Structure formats: structure tokens, C-alpha cells
Amino acid sequence: MKLVFTVDCGTMSYSEMEFAKEEGLDVIVLDHHQPEAKYPEAFAFINPNRFDDDSQLGYLAAVGVSFMFLVSLNRKLRSENWFDSNNLEEPNLITFLDLIALGTICDSVPLKGINRLMVIKGLEVIQKRKNHGLNALIDIAEINQKVSVYDLGFKLGPRINAAGRIGKSNFGVCLLYTSDAADEVLG
């Protein structure tokens, strides 16, 4: 089985979903954009703005939708004893809240409900300074106090987005997921 995830896109990607289907790919769409009357033909279409969704989470950014998907998947795998059966350690999803907070703020979604909670908890994770790439970015931005919502939206986010404008769209992913001291990534 070939599986593709789309994040923050796919809601209106009818021809792309048809192409994926022709290529034998299953696609899971994780999005938050407003859909039209019909949905893309995907293996799964997860969007809190679907007309049949009653979660009242339509204010989530795609990063929040993705996180909620991972929480649900993690819960399901745990209930089926999948981690133990495969001799794998269950991931601690809390450690990703730094990135969830960054994405939530940078997508300019309302800071209410679970968004607010994810940002508050994400800022706590950031203060622990365990993400090498994010630490390097914080140092470059000369943020010498506790990282704030303002810092995420106006100092860190724009630096990550700038790489995409000069043809290095994977730079942000490389930076935020590096296990090195980020020196090689930042060059």
C-alpha cells in the first residue's frame, strides 16, 4: 500500500486526488480550509470544516488538525497494544507542541479553545529548549527572554517562511527536526 498525507491542502484538490487514485495511492487529507459542496475523493478527508463535522473545531489550523489526528491515532494504537506488540516506544506527542504552537500562531487562526491550550503548552515545551533547530533560530533572533506568542509570529515564523521564498522550501523541516546542534543546517 502506498499512502500519502497532505497537510494544509487537499480540500479543493479534485484532479490531484484523481491522479493519485490512478497511480494506486491512498491519500489522507488533513486540512482546515473551507470545502465546496463536494469533497475530494480521498482515502480519508479529515477537516473540521466539513459540513458533516460537529466538533466545533473549525478554527484549528492544519497543524492543529494534524496534531489531533496523531492524538487519535496514538490512542487507537495504544488500545490495540500495537506499540508493545511491535517492540516500539509510544511517542510522547507533548514534545511536538512547540511546533504545534509555532504553526498555530503563524497560520493566524483564533487563539481560543484548544488552540490557546496548545500554544500555552507549546510555549512551555519551547522554554525547555530541547529542539536544536528552534534553539538556533531563537539565538539568531536574539530572543533573550521567554519566547512569546509575538516572537513565534513575528520573529521565528517569518525566518522559517523566508527560506521558501528563495527556493529552499524544505529548510524549515530540516531545521525544526534536526537532531544536531543545527550548525550544519544553518550553514
Language-model-derived ranges and their functions:
Residues 177-187:
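Single conserved hydrophobic/aromatic residue that forms the stacking wall/gate
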